[in-house]
Structures are given as C-alpha cells and as structure tokens.
Amino acid sequence: MNTTTRRDVRGEFQFHSTGLQPVGGPDRVRRDPVGEAADDLCKAVLTSLRRRDQRERGRQYVRGILATQGRKSIRNIAQQVGGPAAEQSLHHFIAGSTWDWQPIRTALSHYLEESTPLTAWVAQPMAIPKGGDHSVGVGHRFDPHQGQMFRGQQAFGIWFTSSEVITPVGWRLFLPPGEEGAGGPSEREPMPSASGLEAGEEKYESYEECAVTGVLDTVRQCRMPSRPVVLDIRGIGTRSTMNRFAEARLPVLARIGSGARLLVTDPALPGYGAGVLAARDILQNVKGLRIPVEWRDPSHPGARRTSLVAAVRVMMPDPSPARRRQVLLVGEWTDPRRLPSQLWVTDLTRLTPAALLRLTKQARRVSAAASASVQEVGLRDFAGRSLSGWHRHVTMASVAHAARCLGDSVGAVGGGGYARPSAPARVPHPANTSAGVRPAWLWPA
C-alpha cells in the first residue's frame, strides 16, 4: 500500500490508499489550536512577570477564561483550573498583586506584529453596564457613540487590526469627576501612567481626553512602525482631537459629525471663500466628484458592497495660525439620493478616496469582532472595586482574545497557520504615498 507523509497545521498525516490517517494515531492530531495558541502567547508575553508562579497564574487565568462558559468571574475561572484553592491565588493575582500590566500589553502587540503585521489601530468604546456604586468609574452617563444614557463604566479599547487578526491590546477606563477614588485606598497604589491615574493623583479627564490618551499611550508604549489610527470622534472635540494626533505625529482617520465646521481650501470647488461651512454641506456641493468603490463587508463574511465616495481638501478653523492644517474631508454615500452616511477627516492626504474608504472599514471590522467576542472572553466581567484589578483582568482577557483569534486561524479549514508575511515598509507622517499607489499596510480591497 502506497503512503505519502505530509504535515499541516493539525499535525503530521499519512495519505494512505484508504484515506487520510494521522501519523502515530489520533493523539498526534492538534485538537485544541486555541489552547495551544494561548500557551504559546503566555510563554511569550508574560515574561515581564518576575516569578514563575506569577507566570503560571497568568497562564491559568487565560486558560480559565477560554474554558469558562458564561460569566468570566474569578470564581468561575478558578473552577476550570483548580477550584477553591485556585480561586484565592487567582484573586490575589488580579486584585491584590502589584505587577505592571503595560509590558504584557506591549509584548502582546509585538507578538502579533511578528505573526501578522499591523494595518491600523482602532479605538473602540466599550460600555460596561453595572448596578451599584462600588466599582471604580461607575456612573450614570450619556454615551455619545450610542446616543443614550446608561449606568455603568465606560472604557476605550485600542484594537490591533491586521489582515488576519482583530484584537484589543490597550485599555483606558473613563473616570468622571469625583469617581477617581471610588475604588478606595487601592486606587492610590502605584500604577502605570499609560493606563490610569498616577499614584495619588486626583485629575479629572474628559471623555475626549480619555479616548485620545488611551490611543496615544498604547502607541507610544509599543514603539512599532507608524500606522494610522481609526476612531470615531462624533460628539467630542474634532479640532482638539486632530491637533493632539498631529502633535504626536501619528496619522489619523477620524469619523466626524455631519455638522462639524470646516473651510474649503480648493479654489476650484463650491464653497471656497464662503467661510466656515458644515461638513455635510461641503460634501453635498461636490456630489459630482463621487466615484463608486467596492469594499468587503466584515459584518457579512464574503459579501461585497459598493459605496460612492468623494474627498475634498479642507481646513479646520483654529484661533492659532500654526494649527491651521489642511486635511481631507471624506464622504461616503450608501444611497446616492440621500446625505452622506459617514463623514471622516484625515491627514492621510496622499491616499486615494478609494483607499481611504476601505481604511474606514477597519472600524466596522472591529465593531463586528467586538460584538461577537467581547462577551466570550469576559472583557466586561470584572466585578472588583480597584482600577488596577480592572486593568489586570482586561489585560488577561485581551491575551485570551488574541489566542482565540490566532487559534481559530490555525484551526480553520484550509488554514495555513499564522506565519508572518513580509513586513511592510515604515509609513512616514503624513503618509507620503503617491496617488494611486496602495500602501502595503492597507486592508485588502
């Protein structure tokens, strides 16, 4: 009987005349790609934890998250990895320890970059409904992204997006006025400035500042090749947000409200010299410039959509002449007879309208991924009172989320694992890309 031996992501197989059989029997088949990805990740990203028992607690916590059905409380996680005895040690690991979560988040970003290079950072708000008053940051507030009131916590996740992976790697919790000390004395323990208040600091941070600082701190800590930031700034300060990213020399593509006030700077276009105009009116005046662009719909895998898109050079009015910069106003029409469905501003002025439209869909990819996976890894499930405990929990949950992404890519039918493709070139800021040339980091059309 003729046989041929081959290897794929499931292990080593022999192709017999009677069919496919694993070499060495069924035990050689990879039966848990997500678990294996989790072990590999933990080995790589938990190295900043000095003690071996801490690294083991971290691995147990990640594995427990992946194995737990329903709410990912410390008690439920412990039931998967050792019961009551494990519960006490895991509780101390998350809520009572002093390890720094930022090096783990940075290591996670670098691990992912080695596997599947970064396309863009996406800032995604995450509302965490909660009753009671004991958890840090809980309040009754208006969510500008959802357009409704809710009671609970408001966090911002900074998501790593690539052609293969969509996963959070950074977090910041919004702390309203008077809430900074809501977690009690533990809130004043030393914490990394990138992820919360400085030790003993009583500083109010606006919703806008929280969103932008979360992105900037994550990117600074990672020190990776420059990639665009995609975020939604409707309902928060358009001008101040864009200025902060410009000062950080970080390219940005920001969704804005239709009433945002801008100046047309192209003498050949309607609205030039007319003063400050609403963004929707500027775009309605240039409907003749619209072109059709096809894009993949991440909400419906395999589906392709077509939108009309136009881009106009504009300026954000600013009292300081030094801050008056030209940007592109990008409009998308899903219905050509109506007003633009989405409006964006960007300093990626060398990219084509088609490339910019497809880049905006990174936000749609993250929204689709978050709606399907945030609950699966318990990102909203921390029930403790301290800010540091919250950060440690969401850090471990982010590692679990990344393991699920990587493991699912390995276990997919016909999948070839997540071997690293060739690294794309560094992107300068502003993106120095000739019109018509598609940068290597852009998500495929």
Range-by-range predicted roles:
Residues I166-T167, W171, E179-E180, G257, ...:
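An anionic, glycine-rich sequence signature occurring as long contiguous blocks
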Residues P192-T265:
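Domain-level cores of phosphate- or acyl-group-handling catalytic modules
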Residues C42-Q102, T106, V229, A403, ...:
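Short, positively charged, Gly/Tyr-enriched micro-motifs
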Residues T98-G178:
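Active-site-proximal, Lys/Arg-enriched surface segment
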Residues R350-A383:
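Short amphipathic alpha-helical "interface-anchor" segments enriched in bulky aromatics
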Residues I77, T119-P129, I158, R227-I236, ...:
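Short, conserved catalytic/metal-binding motifs centered on acidic residues
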Residues N2-D40, V45-Q54, L175, L269-P317, ...:
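A short, flexible helix-boundary coil/loop motif
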Residues Q146-C222, P340-S341:
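Electropositive, glycine- and tryptophan-enriched low-complexity nucleic-acid-binding patches
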